[in-house]
Amino acid sequence: MVNIIVVGLQWGDEGKGKVVDWLSTNADAVVRFQGGNNAGHTIVVNDNVYKLNLLPSSVLQNGKLSIIGNGVVLDPYALISEIENLKSNGINITSQNFAISESCPLVLSVHKQADMLFEQLRQDTIGTTNKGIGPCYADKISRRAIRVCDLFDPKDLLHNKVNHLLSYHNLLRKNINNPSIETENIVNELLSIAPKILPFVQPVWKTIHNLIEQNKTIIFEGAQGTFLDIDHGTYPFVTSSNTIAQQAFIGCGINPSNKTHILGLVKAYTTRVGNGPFFTEQNNNIGKTMFESGKELGTVSNRQRRCGWFDAVLARQAVILSGVSGLVMTKLDVLDQFSEIKICVKYKYENKIYDYLPASPYIQSKLEPVYETLPGWQTSTFGSVSYKDLPQNAISYIKKIEEILKVPIYLISTGPERNSMIIINNDFLYK
């Protein structure tokens, strides 16, 4: 039995989908444990490109159980659309290979409308995807969310729960001169989608526990990245859930006593979608080259990702926060063109040096990166599958990051295809 939690150590888009797809070849189940359809995974298999938002990456492989845990906020329409899209490509999702937690809060039309309204009212936008994720999590915390299990209720009970939800939302809408939403409209939405969702619903905490008891291998697939975490990220430019490894235990109901490997993903450089601090950002030809070579467009938003040098301060802090035991580096090939490559090793502000990210947004806005410069390799690493065949300067770059982060790199991704992977150490898959 092996349990592996996969988390991003930057601002998301580290390539978790491809890596989980690769790992799931040796797994029995893959579990999503937080976020919603505001996160996107792009997976390339035999030149076919699949873009997933809610479904775990394992759905592309036969014989794997894919699970959505209770920590996910579930947009039922987005899920059904994703399932139908895969079906049109010959991939069938059934109750035998897919399960949804009965405790998932549902993202409804009222949440998406609230997301757009709140973003318009903010003085400084945070760059929300307008998918309704934040308002849904807010309703969950305030104990008024409609959950998947509520779809089993008699209609009159469901009506009462929706009425309670809308008593809050309609009050807000009234204050900004927006028309109220009728309870019956939301109830009808739910009744129409219920038959398509309920066949997949089960107590997934129990399902996962049974898999662990049977010594099965489970991958826990994180969404977004460490510095989008609601508690540990660059607040307020963050998502609405916890994105670090510990959320896996809460977001699907497993206990921390189970032996778990925690795999942290980093790009060989840094990217960010949307607003917020970005200490190594390159608004120049360097950033443009990274953007073009890395094809840096958001899977969900289709927005251009901002690009910059590798930030080892952030990555080291992320390693500590999640207790990372091994690293995966992705998109090494994007750096092939540079004659020299920089790594941010410290921040400075007013003659003070920081080896961590201060929580204060004000101080964050003043931080300047302190770089260490390494020679580039200017030789193609694209599609490489052998570590010893990498250019020596590429190996030196990898070793420098291992040295700073104090964690070994197990895998290196050198292209979008499933098998474009350098395996340095895969012992974690078997013990």
UniProtKB/Swiss-Prot annotation:
Positions contributing to substrate binding: 299-305
Cofactor: record remark: Binds 1 Mg(2+) ion per subunit.
Keyword annotations: Cytoplasm, GTP-binding, Ligase, Magnesium, Metal-binding, Nucleotide-binding, Purine biosynthesis
Database matches in CDD domains: AdSS
Catalyzed reactions: IMP + L-aspartate + GTP = N(6)-(1,2-dicarboxyethyl)-AMP + GDP + phosphate + 2 H(+)
Keyword Ligase carried by entry: yes
Pathway terms, separated by semicolons: Purine metabolism; AMP biosynthesis via de novo pathway; AMP from IMP: step 1/2
GO BP of this protein: 'de novo' AMP biosynthetic process; IMP metabolic process
Coiled coil: none
Assembly and binders: Homodimer.
Family affiliation: Belongs to the adenylosuccinate synthetase family.
Protein name from the UniProt record: Adenylosuccinate synthetase
Source species of the chain: Ehrlichia canis (strain Jake)
Gene that specifies this protein: purA
